[in-house]
């Protein structure tokens, strides 16, 4: 059984290879702008900016494009102003969702999300009714092939500030408090590991979905991620691996 993390990995891998790459760039540019505006232009002291730069590099965004986005966010260049919005949602199968958007018009974005939810079996939740089901965390990933001694690796990560290590899949995931993510990543890199990280929301508990609910849920996730204003969708579901793969192939 796998959940939202596996879905996101599959989705991002396929998007990176197809015509939707320009959409990924648009989302990352907004992320860079907002992070620079809210926390400054130094990634060493701004974890959100550092995570956005990591994401930009992973998507092979040109350095010039990154730098322009950061300067726009800091006010050094003229550009649109985006604000963060977090929407709490109930999805098919009793799944809880957080939808994180960066938008220049909150009313438009809320209207578009409501429309998508109404078409795909979801609905907006009252403020506070879903957010408590998730925790803000840093997640660092390391290719499993680089880890020759898992015990030694785990000890290194824990000493650096890791809260949990999930080594059942590839890549290995290290969970940290948001403020510790950069320290843990640095410690791993200093010891020769290739580490990338993001700031995310992790569900405290999960709901198992299958059949019709599973198909409706993945369709909803797809259309939400295709919305220009939506940066990330976090959901608390578990699904059989083979069923998830089959449904995603069906939706291509």
Curated annotation (Swiss-Prot):
Q: Name a single GO biological process.
A: regulation of DNA-templated transcription
Give the main location.
Answer: cytoplasm
- Residues of the signal peptide: none
Q: Does the keyword Protein biosynthesis apply?
A: no
| Transcription among keywords | yes
* NCBIfam families in UniProt: PRK00110.1, PRK12378.1, YebC/PmpR family DNA-binding transcriptional regulator
Q: Which UniProt keywords apply?
A: Cytoplasm, DNA-binding, Transcription, Transcription regulation
The record's listing under Gene3D superfamilies reads: 1.10.10.200, 3.30.70.980
GO cellular component entries: cytosol
Q: What is this protein called?
A: Probable transcriptional regulatory protein Kole_1935
> Where is the protein localized?
Cytoplasm
Family of this protein: Belongs to the TACO1 family.
Q: Which HAMAP family match?
A: Transcrip_reg_TACO1 (MF_00693)
The GO terms this record gives for MF are:
DNA binding
The disulfide bridges present are none
């Amino acid at each position: 059984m796998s959940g939202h993390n596996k879905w996101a990995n599959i989705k991002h891998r396929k998007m990176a290879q197809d015509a939707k790459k320009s959409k990924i760039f648009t989302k990352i540019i907004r992320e860079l702008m907002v992070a620079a505006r809210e926390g400054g232009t130094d990634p060493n002291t701004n974890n959100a900016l550092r995570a956005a730069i990591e994401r930009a590099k992973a998507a092979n965004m040109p350095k010039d494009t990154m730098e322009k986005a950061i300067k726009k966010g800091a006010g050094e260049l003229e550009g649109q102003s985006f604000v963060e919005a977090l929407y709490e949602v109930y999805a098919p199968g009793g799944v809880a969702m957080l939808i994180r958007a960066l938008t220049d018009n909150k009313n438009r974005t809320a209207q578009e999300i409501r429309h998508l939810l109404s078409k795909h079996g979801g609905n907006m939740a009252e403020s506070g009714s879903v957010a408590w089901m998730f925790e803000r965390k840093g997640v660092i990933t390391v290719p499993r092939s680089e880890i020759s001694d898992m015990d030694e690796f785990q000890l290194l990560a824990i000493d650096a500030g890791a809260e949990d290590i999930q080594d059942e899949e590839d890549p290995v995931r290290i969970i940290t408090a948001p403020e510790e993510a950069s320290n843990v990543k640095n410690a791993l890199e200093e010891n020769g590991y290739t580490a990338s990280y993001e700031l995310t929301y992790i569900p405290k508990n999960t709901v198992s979905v299958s059949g019709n609910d599973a198909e409706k849920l993945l369709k909803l996730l797809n259309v939400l991620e295709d919305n220009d204003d939506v940066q990330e969708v976090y959901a608390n579901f578990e699904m059989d691996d083979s069923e998830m793969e089959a449904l995603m192939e069906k939706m291509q």
